[in-house]
Structures are given as C-alpha cells and as structure tokens.
C-alpha cells in the first residue's frame, strides 16, 4: 500500500464520521431547519474520494477504500454517538451504514463503466446517482415514522449534495493532473 491509498482511506473515514455527526444538526437560518442539515455539505466529499480512488487505482481498490470508510464510520458511530437505549440513534447508525455502503459501491460501478467518456461524465453521473440513492436510503431508514420531516429534509439534503458534487468537479479535475504525475 502506498501513501495515497492510506490518505484516501483515512480521508474517507473522516468524511463518514464528520457527516454522521453533522447530519444531527439542522441549519437554523432562513427557515432551513425543516429542509437541511450540515451533513449535506460534507458527505459529497466521499464521492470525490471514491472517484479519485477509482480513477487512480481502478474499481477494486476503490471498493477497498469504501469498505475501510464503512468500517471506520460504523465502528466509531456505534462506539461514540449511538445511545442504544434511543431507537432513533440506532436507526441513524444503521441508515448511515446501509446508505453509505450501497451508494458508494454503486458510485464505484457507475464510474468504472463511464471512465472512458469525457473526464467529467463519470464523476458527475456516479455522484448524482449515488447521492440520490444515499439520501433516500439514509433518511427513510433513519427517520421514517418518527415525526421528523424526513421527506423534506431528504430533498433539501439532495439539492445541496448535487450542488456540492458539481463544485467537486473542480478539485477532481485539478487532482487528476497531480495523480497522473505521481502515477500511483
């Protein structure tokens, strides 16, 4: 394993942990508390990491990074932020892990199928589809029948994730040149 693989794996774990923490906090400005949480801003970085790993190493190594991120995220979420007496906390842990794993593995597969197209098609398509799957899996598993406005939160969350995914094309493109120069 080289340093880039370790760095991407570590960053994936950080993104998962940060997002799991930040999703608990609705944005309380401009009436957005019913629509949006802070987790929507950090989570799309996971797709950037997955797509960079996929472009650099291929889908098998990208999957390993997804599994490492999943293990870190679920382990730390269960250890530090899950109150097992509180059903919603357990549902968030299960929803987060399920949504992350399904969406990221889907992202890896879609990216791999589109990798020979123009540079932006694979990351934007895989991130868009992965974000959509992640959002609706997470919110439905975590908050269905709780009284929390999970449908409106999920649409607000998805809108931000798509916006951030578009912005993530900039670092993706810039880092492609760096990764090619390093030739991992």
Regions found by a protein language model. Name each.
Residues 90-183:
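Membrane-embedded alpha-helical hairpins and interfacial helices in multi-pass inner-membrane proteins
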Residues 16-24, 76-84, 138, 142, ...:
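Structural signal for membrane-spanning alpha-helices in multi-pass inner-membrane proteins
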Residues 72-100:
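Helix-adjacent hinge/juxtasegments
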Residues 1-55, 60:
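Hydrophobic transmembrane alpha-helices
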């Amino acid at each position: 394993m080289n340093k880039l693989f370790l760095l991407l794996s570590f960053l994936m774990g950080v993104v998962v942990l940060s997002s799991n923490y930040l999703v608990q906090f609705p944005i309380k400005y401009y009436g957005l508390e019913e629509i949006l949480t802070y987790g929507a801003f950090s989570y799309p970085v996971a797709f950037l990491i997955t797509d960079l790993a996929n472009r650099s190493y291929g889908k098998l190594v990208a999957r390993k990074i997804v599994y490492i991120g999943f293990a870190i995220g679920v382990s730390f979420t269960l250890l530090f932020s899950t109150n097992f007496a509180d059903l919603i906390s357990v549902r968030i842990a299960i929803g987060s892990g399920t949504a992350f794993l399904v969406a990221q593995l889907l992202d890896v597969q879609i990216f791999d199928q589109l990798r020979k197209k123009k540079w932006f098609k694979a990351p934007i398509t895989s991130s868009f589809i992965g974000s959509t799957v992640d959002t609706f899996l997470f919110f439905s598993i975590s908050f269905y029948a709780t009284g929390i406005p999970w449908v409106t939160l999920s649409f607000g969350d998805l809108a931000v994730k798509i916006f951030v995914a578009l912005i993530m094309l900039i670092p993706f493109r810039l880092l492609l040149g760096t990764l090619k120069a390093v030739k991992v």
